[in-house]
Design a protein with these regions (language model features):
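Active-site His/acidic residue clusters
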Residues: 216-234
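A short C-terminal boundary segment appended to hydrolase-like catalytic domains
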Residues: 304-365
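Bacterial N-terminal signal peptides
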Residues: 10-20
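Residue-level marker for buried hydrophobic side chains located in beta-strands
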Residues: 35-37, 64-66, 119-120, 212, ...
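N-terminal active-site segment of His-dependent metallophosphoesterases
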Residues: 24-95
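Active-site glycine-centered loops adjacent to acidic/histidine catalytic or metal-binding residues
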Residues: 40, 68-69, 122-123, 215, ...
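Bacterial N-terminal signal peptides that target proteins for export
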Residues: 1-11
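Extended active-site neighborhood of metal-dependent phosphoesterases/phosphodiesterases
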Residues: 78-206, 210, 228-241, 245-251, ...
Length: 365
């Protein structure tokens, strides 16, 4: 484990605020570029994800990153049962399991066209009978995408193994996709890989920023009850990963941003808790589980407002400045955002159901 030392909340917040101000003063639109992120697209993802793709294309981002939970797996997704070819039929679970991942690719990933898409693994991708090994086989094309394969071979020319965790470089930013889809993660092998990567990044002057994405949020966030804290291996390894990232900020002088989904709402500044402010500092963090899954109520400790919203669908639009600072904006999508062809295929009544009824959270006045 990398050695970590304490850094107060005010120091980290002040540093990030200062760098954000400087970026706004010194970066021109020509110096910036964008990427997009969201996760959790079961239930209504076949309707919501095409809307996300259509909105994303207007920004011309470098890529889209899905943080996991493509399909429900344990039961039929509502969008699956409302497809015309399934209407009025009694579906079998074997038929569903045999087609659910292809359904995801056909209806949720195909709308992105030639835009690079990076896939993270969620807990629903490992619900029995699904396994991590089956996931690797099914999504090998994405896990061995050109950017990932090139980076893996730069790290080790003899490494041809596909993994559910990986990283790739875009300009001066290192993007790290971690796997915490099962309760035993992060295991020793993944932690060793992660910490060695952070060590290399800290020694590399060409890396200004580290963006870490995963399905479940690291422990001790505002959304702690639905995070890596749900298992002891997750709690211990997640806290260790958090301290490793703090070390990269304090001693490596890197900018660090942490992204997760799993909770089906939008929330920013998720690590602004008493525990973390007293145990090293608060990293910038977001939850963006808003790509179609049944919406959850916000945690009791969350302050409702622009930075914490439920009963919404959308994605994060990230704008990267030349110095590596990143501005994240939540792009909220309305029912009218659904492409006409998708609304016609699923019928307006079901599209409205997705926006109005696909929720376990109370409606706000």
């Amino acid at each position: 484990m990398l050695k970590s030392r304490s850094l107060g909340l005010a120091a980290i917040a002040g540093t990030l605020l200062l760098t954000g101000i400087l970026a706004a003063q010194t970066s021109s639109p020509r110096d910036t570029w964008q990427f997009t992120v969201s996760g959790d697209s079961r239930n209504c993802g076949d309707v919501v994800m095409p809307a996300i793709a259509a909105d994303i294309m207007s920004h011309h981002p470098a890529f889209y990153w899905h943080l996991g939970d493509f399909r429900a797996t344990y039961t039929f997704d509502e969008d699956y049962t409302h497809q015309p070819e399934h209407a009025g039929r009694t579906l079998s679970i074997s038929e569903y399991l045999g087609t659910e991942w292809q359904d995801f690719l056909d209806n949720q990933i195909a709308p992105f066209g030639t835009l690079p898409v990076f896939l993270g693994i969620g807990n629903h991708e490992t619900i029995p009978p699904r396994t991590r090994e089956e996931y690797i086989a099914e999504f090998a094309e994405w896990l061995d995408a050109p950017a990932i394969r090139a980076q893996r071979h730069r790290d080790n020319p003899r490494d041809f193994r596909l993994r559910t965790y990986y990283h790739w470089r875009e300009r001066n930013v290192d993007f790290i996709n971690l796997d915490n889809s099962t309760l035993d993660q992060f295991d020793a092998e993944q932690m060793l890989w992660f910490e060695r990567l952070l060590e290399r990044d800290q020694a590399d002057g060409s890396v200004a920023t580290i963006v870490v994405g995963m399905h479940e949020a690291l422990p001790d966030s505002i959304a702690n009850d639905h995070s890596m804290s749900e298992s002891l291996p997750g709690l211990f390894s997640g806290r260790r990963a958090y301290q490793d990232l703090l070390y990269a900020v304090i001693h490596g002088h890197k900018l660090v941003y942490v992204l997760a989904s799993h909770s089906h709402f939008y929330m920013e500044n998720i690590f602004n808790t008493d525990y973390l402010s007293q145990h090293g500092g608060v990293l910038p963090g977001w939850i963006i589980g808003t790509a179609g899954a049944v919406r959850y109520d916000l945690p009791s400790k969350a302050t409702r407002g622009p930075g914490a919203r439920t009963n919404v669908y959308g994605y994060l639009l990230a704008t990267v400045n030349a110095d590596g600072t990143i501005h994240f904006e939540f792009r909220n999508l309305e029912e009218t955002s659904v492409p006409a062809a998708i609304a016609a295929r699923y019928k307006p009544e079901f599209v409205h159901w997705c926006w109005d009824q696909n929720s376990q959270a109370p409606k706000q006045p």
